Amino acid sequence: MNNACLFAYNELNRRADSLKHADMGTTMVMASIEGNVVTIAHIGDSRCYILRKDGGLLYQTEDHVNRILGWETLSRCFFSYKSGNVIPDIIQLYLEAGDRILLCSDGIYKSIIPYILEERMMDNKLPEDILETFDFLCEKNGNDNYTAILACIE
């Protein structure tokens, strides 16, 4: 996971330099599943939620955000001209059949009330149908771009 993060970091910096976008920054969340173990890496305010079929929220990443005078600013991001702190948080968890993993940008969780987000994640539907519901809710309630990946563990 560390090697994948380092590779992505170096590639993003190379592209930003070649495009004269040295003032850019981004957030990142990723998951790698091997057997019944998931490794989550994240930095910034993109999130990972893991819900257990019978137990509710098992895990949620903690945003790297400062709130100053009502404004949110990233305290850490994946690469940025402002900060050398690009070390992601990494955690490993055991998965069970029925668990659901959502990787998403802030446009998702800022557009959908948390309990509705969790309820929809656990709907007895195909992942693409759940993501269509998220798409509808973000179009209706959101004002940011949004991206999501939903994995259902069998």
Where are these regions (language model features)?
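PP2C/PPM-type serine/threonine phosphatase catalytic domain
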Residues: 1-154
